[in-house]
């Protein structure tokens, strides 16, 4: 979905302008979070780190198989467009160009929280130290998801002409539910960090 006459910004954003490209972006962000977890968790228990990475690898392998089987970005296009297919005009907007990566940083970032919690529960590792460690990942995901939702609402308001920033349709609700879950989780972790309670909620 790139085009030779488009600015570089839209050539790059055209990568995730279709279903296959957006799933590739999803895998890229998932890999990025695994790398960041490796860097930021060096002080944590080795078994906990290994088990967290194992759960993350299961997730990424599942997505990889799904992409190859159902949404392969390597399928041939015939006839080959000389200048490129180009991006849908409604998607040629700065807010929407950065909306998917930011939203994915929020969505995919929560996979680290999921894997870490599974690992910590399996090893009985949930403690104040673990709460301090996981809190930063919850906050990162929450911030990016918040920005992504706001960008999507602004774009929908002036581009689609819905007449408002928010409507209770499935497209918007599907991003609101994880945001509410992350907000609740963040507050539970704050309580866990200070009082060592609400472990079952976390």
Region locations from a protein language model:
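Polytopic transmembrane helical bundles with strong interfacial aromatic enrichment
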Residues: 1-202
């Amino acid at each position: 979905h790139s085009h030779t006459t488009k600015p570089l910004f839209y050539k790059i954003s055209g990568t995730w302008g279709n279903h296959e490209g957006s799933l590739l972006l999803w895998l890229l962000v998932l890999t990025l979070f695994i790398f960041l977890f490796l860097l930021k968790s060096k002080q944590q228990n080795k078994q906990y780190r290994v088990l967290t990475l194992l759960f993350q690898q299961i997730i990424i392998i599942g997505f990889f198989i799904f992409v190859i089987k159902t949404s392969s970005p390597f399928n041939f296009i015939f006839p080959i467009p000389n200048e490129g297919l180009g991006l849908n005009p409604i998607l040629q907007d700065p807010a929407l160009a950065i909306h998917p990566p930011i939203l994915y940083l929020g969505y995919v970032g929560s996979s680290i929280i999921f894997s870490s919690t599974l690992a910590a529960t399996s090893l009985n590792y949930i403690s104040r130290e673990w709460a301090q460690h996981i809190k930063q990942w919850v906050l990162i995901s929450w911030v990016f998801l918040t920005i992504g939702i706001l960008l999507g609402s602004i774009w929908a308001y002036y581009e689609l002409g819905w007449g408002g920033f928010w409507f209770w349709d499935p497209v918007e609700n599907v991003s609101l539910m994880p945001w509410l879950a992350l907000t609740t989780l963040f507050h539970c972790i704050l309580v866990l960090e200070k009082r060592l309670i609400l472990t079952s909620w976390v």
